[in-house]
């Protein structure tokens, strides 16, 4: 029988989708930030393909420990920095030479305006409360560069306590262009967006397009 790790296969699939939009960075050193990246499986695949990438991991402190261990093992000799470095150096740490900067999630609001080339979130925003979604989106929409990308792969609808976490109600502003929008091949209850950041008042009208995605999913349930 063929044996494989489904989670690792999912990371391969997701990295393949994301890397198609990051190909221009193949020989450069972009800052790529993953929110809620688990142990670092997806980040390791991105890093293997964009070797100069400076990857910022944002997660729970206890998960940061696993990320530090795993990524240090996969990339022997990699420069892995953490919250201590941010505390001691401040934002200068972002200009340092590093492969991975591993930080608690709340540190996202320290990222300077228009400093990140790409954000990634796979199946963790769907676990967030309304307040946490608003916190992360405010930071992402400020710190992502114009023309930067946001890969957002999350459930259409998921109850989180008394809060109905709905993709079509995420606090996006209007200034996004859709590069990819599709249901996941392996998990059709997950929608996969890859979006490009646009300038303020771009006329992209993204929020209406987001609502249309939600309406289409609701109709599919009837």
Residue ranges and their predicted role:
Residues 120:
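A conserved beta-strand element that flanks and buttresses the S-adenosyl-L-methionine
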Residues 27-38:
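Conserved class I S-adenosyl-L-methionine
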Residues 71-112:
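S-adenosyl-L-methionine
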Residues 197-222:
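Membrane-proximal basic amphipathic "stem/tether" segments
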Residues 146-156:
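Conserved beta-strand signature within the Rossmann-like core of class I S-adenosyl-L-methionine
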Residues 40-50:
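Conserved SAM-binding loop of SAM-dependent methyltransferases across substrates and taxa
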Residues 1-27:
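Conserved Class I S-adenosyl-L-methionine-dependent methyltransferase catalytic core
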Residues 134-146:
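A short glycine-rich, Lys/Arg-flanked "PGG" loop and its adjoining helix->strand segment in the class I
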């Amino acid at each position: 029988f063929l044996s494989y790790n489904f989670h690792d296969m999912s990371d391969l699939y997701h990295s393949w989708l994301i890397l198609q939009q990051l190909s221009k960075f193949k020989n450069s050193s972009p800052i790529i930030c993953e929110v809620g990246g688990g142990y670092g499986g997806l980040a390791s695949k991105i890093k293997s393909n964009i070797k100069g990438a400076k990857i910022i991991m944002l997660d729970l402190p206890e998960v940061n420990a696993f990320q530090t261990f795993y990524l240090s093992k996969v990339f022997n000799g990699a420069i892995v920095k953490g919250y201590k470095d941010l505390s001691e150096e401040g934002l200068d740490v972002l200009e340092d030479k590093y492969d991975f900067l591993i930080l608690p999630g709340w540190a996202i609001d320290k990222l300077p305006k228009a400093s990140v080339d790409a954000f990634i979130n796979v199946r963790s925003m769907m676990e967030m409360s309304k307040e946490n979604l608003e916190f992360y989106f405010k930071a992402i929409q400020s710190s992502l560069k114009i023309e930067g990308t946001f890969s957002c792969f999350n459930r259409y609808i998921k109850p989180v306590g008394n809060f109905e976490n709905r993709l079509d109600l995420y606090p996006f502003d209007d200034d996004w262009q859709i590069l990819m929008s599709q249901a996941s091949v392996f998990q059709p209850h997950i929608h996969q967006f890859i979006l490009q950041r646009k300038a303020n008042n771009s006329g992209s009208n993204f929020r209406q397009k987001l609502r249309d995605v939600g309406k289409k999913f609701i109709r599919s349930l009837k």
